[in-house]
Amino acid sequence: MLFDVKAPILGFETIHKMHLQKVDEIFLRLNSAEDNSVVSFTLVNPFALRKYEFEVPTPLKILLELEGAKSVLIANIMVVQTPIELSTVNYLAPLIFNLDKQLMGQVVLDSNKYPHYHLRENILSHTHE
């Protein structure tokens, strides 16, 4: 599915279109959809790994037209390592997808408000909660 990037991924501010592909119930691939860019991310469904909740800031709700949206997806960027157990997840900067309108953006959460989320957490650190 092709998405318009309304709130850019940090460090990739020049990318305005991205393609999201579901791998399975836990993993997804996010690739740039522009000819001049070869950017690819592995994403993970945070709810499959841990209890995860946060408040979406109002400006991002407006940008992504989340009010009244029926299909919203939250995913987090994962840094894949070998073996997979060494992989890390960025829980502090989730990606939000409005599947109805094909809009997406990244929100950086306030670490003071969400001290239990970090930029690099081991993928297995919450699997037994």
Curated annotation (Swiss-Prot):
It comes from Helicobacter pylori (strain HPAG1). Interacts with translational regulator CsrA and flagellin(s). This is Flagellar assembly factor FliW 2. GO terms for cellular component: cytoplasm. It is found in: Cytoplasm. It comes from the Bacteria. Pfam families: FliW. The keyword Cytoplasm applies. Keywords: Bacterial flagellum biogenesis, Chaperone, Cytoplasm, Translation regulation.
